[in-house]
Amino acid sequence: MDSAKNEIRDNMQIDWDAPIRMDDGVVLRADVYHPVGKGKFPVILSYGPYAKGLSFQEGYKSQWARLTKAAPEVLQNSSNSYQNWELVDPEKWVPDGFALVRVDSRGAGCSPGTLDVWSAREAQDLYACVEWAGTQAWSNGKVGINGISYYAMNQWNVGALKPPHLAALCIWEGSSDYYRELCRHGGILCDFLNSWHPRQVASVQHGVGSRGAKSLVTGEPVAGPETLPKEELAKHCADTPGEPKRRRLHDDYYAARTADFAQIEAPLLSAANWGGVGLHTRGNFEGWLAAGSQQKWLEVHGDTHFTHFYSNYGETLQKRFFGHFLKGEDTGWSKQPRVSLNIRHPNEKFVRRDENEWPLARTKWTKYFLRPDGQGLGLDAPTAATALSYETMGDGLTFRTPPLTKSLEITGPVAAKLWVSSETTDADIFLVLRLIDPAGKDVTFIGSNDPRTPVGLGWLRASHRKLDPALSRPYRPWHTHDKEWPLKPGEPVELDIEIWPTCIVVPPGYRLALTIRGKDYEVDGTDAALSNAPYPMKGVGPFLHIDPDDRDPKIFASRNTLHFTADKAPYLLLPVIPEG
């Protein structure tokens, strides 16, 4: 099929499987939605591996149920027939004069080729798709890219390539550092790709064909018209989960999947989620800070990974942004604050506040020292030399502030400095920033994936403690991950550990706590047991660190010791925001 099938449905002109030829001859397929009749429309484009024909409701039942409960307005003013995972609804955008282009990425859905997610080839393809969309008869020549997660992450990469028709980027919950945020947290292998790739990507690889799902709209297979043997599919699918397991240190493989942010020039909106512990949160902040764009905005919200992308709040924000840059309309965006934060309180309360920068200029960086006597957390450093040990497969050590006498806002990046020794030649350190209510119970928050997440998480493999002095900040250490420095059993080493950006207003009577442990955080050992959930949710969702080859029990299932001396007092550096 060399041309698209065109039809008018639900007051939209739809071109199914429009061909987009790449420079190597591979033809990618896109579904195009635009207003009926002649005209030149601004374009909202996406490129990704989730199959443009797979309905959100069928492919992601648990997430759809959570979305429509949290944001019931999603069901209004739309038949929802064209809903696709992590992309905008055509029935809500085309009536506003936008054209939507959904491209199946190379090797996925209806596009043939080798499936190699986040590769340099994908960025080149996305560049070509932007240029194709910007030169069609129905296009006004201005192309914006929009989408959550995968559809956000690849925007950093193509933005750095500067396609001429690229006019705006909306990077909604999109990681920006392939090694540090997706594959290896603090050098520790994250198991996410092992569950994500077969479930969400390989299941719709081009050539799955009749073995896979069918479009609820067209009745056609969402993973291509041909059905290939599984052996053939394997030949055309990169070993995405296996590469990070084999590559313990940062190398060219990871570098090729991480953008040169200084090259990005297009206006961009980076939308982060306070609850994105384990994948995207850090990337939205770091990418925004590093991007070369003169016109860039940061927005931060809460709730699930998808709620506010589809809610009236998020849709309005996106349309104001794209209306300004793609249509040239006066949407009020010229008055949009460069930083817009939804400040988080317990019980899922958020209060919007406008700011000028990140981290906030008025931050009082405050050291909260870990105290071995009673395992307290406070402003006074301990003076006596001592040590506390913990079993790495146990609950670890928890240090708590006294109940607060007045509210305390923590908004920004967090870091800890510890002196740790191990019985072996290495140690994996898991940090959990927690909120404890007056009854002594953990206060958790709806996270992007898991409905019960803590205030913040941080990780570091002790052998990866080498810092880059040029990139490190007291509040955000930057580890090179290019060398392994083994420990000498029993000998303490200094560790600077990053806890990803967070926000919480701690009410009077509550406590802040820091837990140091040797394995993933769990709320109480139970599963949240969401209907149709694709994985257990015990506090960190799919972002587990349990690979026995990466975390050899002979090394990591042991005993660690936290050391205290007068001149080496471990502390937590908190971004305290003064009242008023």
Predicted regions and their residues:
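N-terminal cap/lid segment of alpha/beta-hydrolase-fold proteins
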Residues: D2-G39, V43, R400-K406, W419-V420, ...
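Accessory cap/linker subdomain of secreted extracellular hydrolases
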Residues: G53-Q57, K61-S79, Q83-P90, P95, ...
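Glycine/threonine-rich phosphate-binding loop and adjacent beta-strand/alpha-helix elements that clamp
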Residues: N77, G314-T316, L326-G580
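Alpha/beta-hydrolase active-site loop
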Residues: N84-W85, P95, V117-A137
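Conserved alpha/beta-hydrolase
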Residues: P90, V94-C110
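Alpha/beta-hydrolase fold nucleophile elbow
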Residues: A137-Y150
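Short glycine-enriched nucleophile-adjacent loop
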Residues: A152-P163, L418
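Short beta-strand/loop motif that positions the catalytic acidic residue
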Residues: I264, S270-A272
